[in-house]
């Protein structure tokens, strides 16, 4: 009898313990956290006269945490790349922001994130489809910006409001707006001249997959070394006044995009440099257009791109390229990109040269 009572008490204790364990719940915000990322491996060769190169390259790696807390989404994204050059890797936090998304008509984002300028800038490198962003995007959207801002991946620190308006009978919204206020100095940089950058954009979406828009940007970059009226070096700010016109169609694996960008304002012309180079002038512009179409849906895409960047808004300073290639998808998480470019750089004595790029990209 005593043994039976002991066994009974043990059974009750085990049952109670099991019930206690089942009542422990993980908070919903923890359940909502998602980890993802991707890597891009690259081989690139080019043959400009006197400066031919070919090299394997770790283009970049991204590690992404996304989460949701009530009506707020948040993201933290770390990037590793050899942006400084072979043997000089850079690992940094590129995105850290929270976003209030209760209403589709009005959303708010705050932190460090992509500037609200152009269609291409916010695109992930792995989904952008090319060996690099267009030259005009790199120079006028805060990558290796012509002002001298260090490479910031098109990002800045600030606050942005945005939303989609005017739903049609099918619920598809026809108009998008976005306006942001930023420090204007790039990633991990505090304000240097107490003058904020204001960037805005609007676009219409008349049919599914099509959007046509325009963007504007006014601001400054502080802590620049420049000349005063007497030729003495002084510290001050340079202006950034820019606009862009954009069009894109993306539907059923077909992607076509074209953008024109214009910039007014002096700069150093070199990323990470704070000395104004007046010989570069205060005007620059550029454009690109590309098409990516399915040859075998879900497996093989063909692509072509034309781009031009004029560092002084003159043809004598233009760099143009004509590009063609293929993107092959082994699975949805593994793809290979092949690209050939014929480049004309008028700043070189022998302006024409070739470039070949091969990439293996994966997602997780």
Predicted regions and their residues:
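Short, surface-exposed beta-strand/loop micro-motifs that present aromatic residues
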Residues: 200-201, 246
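Outer membrane beta-barrel
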Residues: 22-184, 192-196, 203-212, 290-294, ...
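Short, electropositive, low-hydrophobicity segments enriched in small/polar residues
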Residues: 41, 115, 188, 217, ...
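Outer-membrane beta-barrel pore domains
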Residues: 48-50, 97-101, 109-112, 121, ...
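Hydrophobic h-region of N-terminal signal peptides that target proteins for export
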Residues: 10-17
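Positively charged n-region of N-terminal signal peptides that target proteins for export
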Residues: 1-4
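Active-site-proximal beta-alpha loop/turn segments in soluble metabolic enzymes
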Residues: 180-189, 224-230
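Sec-dependent N-terminal signal peptides
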Residues: 6-8
């Amino acid at each position: 009898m005593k043994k039976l009572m002991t066994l009974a008490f043990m059974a009750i204790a085990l049952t109670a313990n099991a019930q206690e364990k089942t009542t422990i719940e993980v908070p919903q915000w923890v359940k909502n956290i998602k980890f993802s990322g991707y890597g891009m491996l690259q081989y690139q060769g080019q043959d400009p006269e006197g400066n031919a190169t070919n090299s394997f390259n770790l283009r970049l790696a991204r590690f992404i945490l996304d989460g949701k807390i009530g009506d707020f989404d948040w993201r933290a994204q770390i990037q590793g790349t050899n942006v400084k050059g072979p043997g000089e890797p850079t690992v940094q936090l590129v995105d850290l922001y929270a976003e209030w998304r209760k209403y589709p008509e009005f959303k708010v984002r705050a932190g460090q994130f992509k500037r609200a300028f152009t269609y291409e800038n916010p695109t992930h490198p792995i989904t952008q489809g090319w060996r690099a962003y267009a030259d005009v995007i790199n120079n006028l959207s805060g990558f290796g910006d012509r002002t001298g801002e260090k490479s910031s991946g098109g990002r800045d620190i600030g606050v942005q409001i945005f939303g989609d308006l005017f739903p049609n009978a099918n619920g598809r919204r026809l108009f998008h707006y976005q306006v942001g206020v930023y420090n204007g100095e790039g990633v991990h940089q505090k304000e240097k001249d107490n003058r904020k950058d204001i960037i805005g954009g609007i676009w219409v979406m008349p049919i599914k997959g099509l959007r046509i828009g325009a963007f504007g940007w006014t601001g400054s970059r502080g802590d620049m070394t420049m000349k005063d009226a007497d030729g003495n070096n002084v510290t001050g700010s340079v202006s950034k006044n820019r606009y862009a016109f954009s069009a894109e169609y993306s539907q059923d694996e077909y992607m076509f995009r074209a953008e024109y960008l214009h910039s007014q304002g002096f700069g150093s012309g070199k990323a990470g440099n704070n000395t104004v180079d007046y010989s570069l002038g205060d005007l620059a512009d550029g454009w690109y257009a590309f098409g990516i179409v399915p040859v075998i849906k879900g497996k093989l895409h063909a692509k072509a791109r034309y781009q031009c960047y004029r560092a002084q808004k003159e043809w004598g300073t233009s760099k143009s390229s004509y590009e063609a290639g293929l993107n092959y998808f082994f699975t949805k998480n593994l793809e290979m990109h092949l690209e050939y470019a014929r480049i004309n750089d008028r700043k070189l004595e022998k302006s024409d040269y070739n470039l070949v790029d091969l990439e293996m990209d994966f997602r997780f």
